[in-house]
Amino acid sequence: MSQERFPAAPKMSSEKPTSLDAMRATNPCETPIQLLHEFGTKTGNHPVYTLEKAEGQAHNPSFTFRLVIGDITSLGEGPSKKTAKQKAAEFALNILRGDTSKCLPVTDTLRDPKKPPNQMQENPVGSLQELAVQKGWRLPEYTVAQESGPPHKREFTITCRVETFVETGSGTSKQVAKRVAAEKLLTKFKTISTDNIPLNKLIGNKMGCTWDSMRNSSGEKISMLKRSPLSIPNTDYVKMLKDVAEELDFNLTYLDIDELSVNGQYQCLAELSTNPITVCHGTGISCGNAHNDAAHNALQYLKIMCIKK
């Protein structure tokens, strides 16, 4: 009596696949974000997502995320943050596979139909405030730095400050710009260990420059500012403001804005750690010109406040 031989069962490999195609074949249901996260874990290069822009109205928002993994950078845009992240991850996967000519469409399959649209998005403003309370910091301060564009297409730039940390956000409404700025600060806090930073360092040692102290100051630089015109061409206002800051003992920081102005010029903000905080906007044909313009505007403001009774 002959024995029938059954085919041998395939050997199971205990090794985990390391190539993208192998990982996708093993887990075909994984989303691009999950697949890229798995790839990053295996290679030691974890993907980092940063919210670049939030535009549109409440009923039709548009988000843009920048993704960095190793030496690769990609952008993704979509009607929700998750969709934008998925598209950025998909494009990064295509680059890793060596195919930059296509970006596979990613449908918004992550939306929960049981939740209304206003509950779909995260609330970075609220999250940042909660973080500040947990750490014992002062609550976030938001300042409108600029409003530009025609009435039907306004563009707002808002600065968000938590202690000495500052970020800017731009959007088609103040609320959107505020959310972007808060999101950027939250992302920054995720990359640093705030638990190891002493509170006195966060608060800073140069927060005592008030308007009254400026008015009563007899320092050389501030006295010169009070009596000098600020309309002389080719003046180095950056140096002039730096000299005033050193004399009055406040911090001076320039924040470059990624987006160009409606006229195609560079933009920046000059932030002075006076009490209260002073933020002035500047534009120019170069980054240096924008800094000089912001310094000029800041000096004009200081001069007005020093003379004002």
Swiss-Prot record:
GO biological process terms on file: regulation of regulatory ncRNA processing; siRNA processing
A Pfam family of this chain: dsrm
Domain DRBM, first and last residues per copy: 31-98, 123-191, 236-304
UniProt region (Disordered), positions on chain: 1-22
Cellular localisation: Cytoplasm, Perinuclear region; Nucleus
InterPro entries: dsRBD_dom, PRKRA_DSRM_1, PRKRA_DSRM_2, PRKRA_DSRM_3, RLC_Component
Major site of localization recorded for this protein: cytoplasm
Superkingdom to which the source organism belongs: Eukaryota
SUPFAM superfamilies: dsRNA-binding domain-like
Assigned keywords, A-Z: Cytoplasm, Nucleus, Repeat, RNA-binding, RNA-mediated gene silencing
Gene Ontology, cellular component aspect: cytoplasm; nucleus; perinuclear region of cytoplasm; RISC complex; RISC-loading complex
Keyword Repeat annotated: yes
Entries under Gene3D superfamilies matching the protein: 3.30.160.20
GO molecular function: double-stranded RNA binding; siRNA binding
Family assignment from sequence similarity: Belongs to the PRKRA family.
Function, in words: Activates eif2ak2/pkr in the absence of double-stranded RNA (dsRNA), leading to phosphorylation of eif2s1/efi2-alpha and inhibition of translation and induction of apoptosis. Required for siRNA production by dicer1 and for subsequent siRNA-mediated post-transcriptional gene silencing. Does not seem to be required for processing of pre-miRNA to miRNA by dicer1.
Assembly and binders: Homodimer. Interacts with dicer1 and eif2ak2/pkr. Also able to interact with dsRNA.
Protein name (Swiss-Prot/TrEMBL): Interferon-inducible double-stranded RNA-dependent protein kinase activator A homolog A
Lineage: Eukaryota, Metazoa, Chordata, Craniata, Vertebrata
